[in-house]
Curated annotation (Swiss-Prot):
Its EC number is 2.4.1.142. Residues 100-120 dip into the membrane without crossing it. The chain crosses the membrane at residues 3-23. Pathway: Protein modification; protein glycosylation. The modification Phosphoserine is found at S242. This is Chitobiosyldiphosphodolichol beta-mannosyltransferase. It comes from the Eukaryota. One of its GO terms (biological process) is dolichol-linked oligosaccharide biosynthetic process. Its main location: endoplasmic reticulum. Belongs to the glycosyltransferase group 1 family. Glycosyltransferase 33 subfamily. InterPro entries: ALG1-like, Glyco_trans_1. Residues 24-99, 121-464 are cytoplasmic. It comes from Pongo abelii (Sumatran orangutan).
Length: 464
């Protein structure tokens, strides 16, 4: 009797879904140029999914983009009438019971919530899904695809289980379960994209998943910032962050001055200050795969070199981003007592971030990759702005950073400090290594995202 009741209950739950799925299959035939894009994360901090949506819209698809709306996406996305952003509510874990139980309950409720949101959306010919996070979104999107006739496209940025392993250890039961889940449901997708050749090979060899490498490429708005816009940005940021403010007042009170630039009151001409500090930029999601103590130790060594009389500029170090370890590192930064270095950790508006990269003198990347198979998108954006980079070494970094060509690769804080000393010696030196790297980046004529997407992704969605 109990078994019969359970079967009846299951049928009662599944029948409406099957009927709704059948109707959505019929609807999908009438909306073949519609795509649903899903990221179980913050849309504003998921640039690659924003770029997918913009590229799809540019080529005639309408797009429904589902994700958390914690940060403002780029204006191009918000102003595109082919793209609809549907906000998801971030579910909080229960505060009772063992942590594993709390996590399990959260995953189940997230699955039901995402299923409900997807089933009441316009059906898409494709469901584009960012992974990670893939638990429970891969299974839910696959199930919805089965019901509605949509083809699941997984864009592999990394492995979710490897990120969990940084916190719990690689042999934790949750991590092993997540790995099995990711591998099992990942094989059920129709198309797979990934960010490096190393990941493509790993997916093929270990998970029997065939993927197409779609390298991260900078969007068109990542470019060198004109001096006038640099000045406006510095004046704006100076309102809330003291490192951007002028070190001294100009003789003419009508002259606008920042820490780096000034605008002549009469002519309106913007010039760089003769003894301006160097602007060093890093961006981060403040997670376990980025060790900012390396940068702080290198800055301490740089400070000592300056105090010892080496010909080095003052530094303004801007670390932008949001994430769980931000408060921890902010506390470490406040404990430092630099005389020639100022550090600030702003969260920038989407439109200001490319302007900052295009105004900086050097980028630093501390991303090491939990799997060793993904590449830091921040470096891609920096290269789009022709900004040279010092990046910490890991397994497949060579696919992006060419040592001594477009930047430098380091292993530890000692090596980073030596690189900072070499690059900023006699700053600003037109004949220095920093300007040579920038020249190489200008001459490389790298593909932009739209050009790369047309070559790699568009043929897949048009042919299938």
């Amino acid at each position: 009797m109990a078994a019969s009741c359970l079967v009846l209950l299951a049928l009662c739950l599944l029948l409406p879904l099957l009927l709704l799925g059948g109707w959505k299959r019929w609807r999908r035939g009438r909306t073949a140029r519609h795509v649903v894009a899903v990221v179980l994360g913050d849309v504003g901090r998921s640039p690659r999914m924003q770029y997918h949506a913009l590229s799809l819209a540019m080529h005639g698809f309408s797009v429904t983009l589902l994700g958390f709306c914690n940060s403002k996406p780029h204006d191009e996305l918000l102003q595109n009438n082919r793209i609809q952003i549907v906000g998801l509510t971030e579910l909080q874990s229960l505060a009772v019971g063992p942590r594993v139980f709390q996590y399990g309950v959260k995953v189940v409720f997230q699955a039901m919530y995402l299923l409900w949101k997807l089933m009441w959306r316009e059906p898409g010919a494709y469901i584009f899904l960012q992974n990670p996070p893939g638990l429970p979104s891969i299974a839910v999107c696959w199930f919805v695809g089965c019901l509605c006739g949509s083809k699941l496209v997984i864009d592999w940025h990394n492995y979710g289980y490897s990120i969990m392993g940084l916190v719990h250890g690689p042999n934790h039961p949750l991590v092993l379960l997540a790995k099995w889940y990711e591998r099992f449901f990942g094989r059920l997708s129709h198309l797979n994209l990934c960010v490096t050749n190393a990941m493509r090979e790993d997916l093929a060899e270990n998970w029997h998943i065939r993927a197409v490498t779609v390298y991260d490429k900078p969007a068109s708005f990542f470019k060198e910032t004109p001096l006038d816009l640099q000045h406006r940005l510095f004046m704006k940021l100076g309102g809330t962050h003291s490192p951007f403010r002028a070190r001294s007042e100009p003789e003419d009170p009508a002259t606008e001055r920042s820490a780096f630039t000034e605008r002549d009151a009469g002519s309106g001409l913007v010039t760089r200050l003769h003894e301006r500090p160097a602007l060093l930029v890093s961006s981060t999601s403040w997670t376990e795969d980025e060790d900012f103590s390396i940068l702080l130790a290198a800055l301490e060594k740089f400070e000592q070199l300056t105090l010892d009389g080496h010909s080095l500029p003052s530094l303004v170090c801007v670390i932008t981003g949001k994430g769980p370890l931000r408060e921890y590192y902010s506390h470490l930064i406040h404990q430092k007592h630099f005389q020639h270095i100022q550090v600030c950790t702003p969260w920038l508006e989407a439109e200001d971030y490319p302007l900052l990269l295009g105004s900086a003198d050097l980028g630093v990347c501390l991303h090491t990759s939990s799997s060793g198979l993904d590449l830091p998108m921040k470096v891609v954006d920096m290269f789009g702005c022709h900004l040279p980079v010092c990046a910490v070494n890991f397994k497949c970094l060579h696919e992006l950073v060419k040592h001594e060509e477009n930047g430098l690769v380091f292993e530890d804080s000692e090596e980073l400090a030596a690189q900072l000393q070499m690059l900023f010696s006699n700053f600003p030196d037109p004949a220095g290594k920093l300007n040579q790297f920038r020249k190489n980046l200008r001459e490389s004529q790298q593909l932009r995202w739209d050009e790369s997407w047309v070559q790699t992704v568009l043929p897949l969605v048009m042919d299938t």
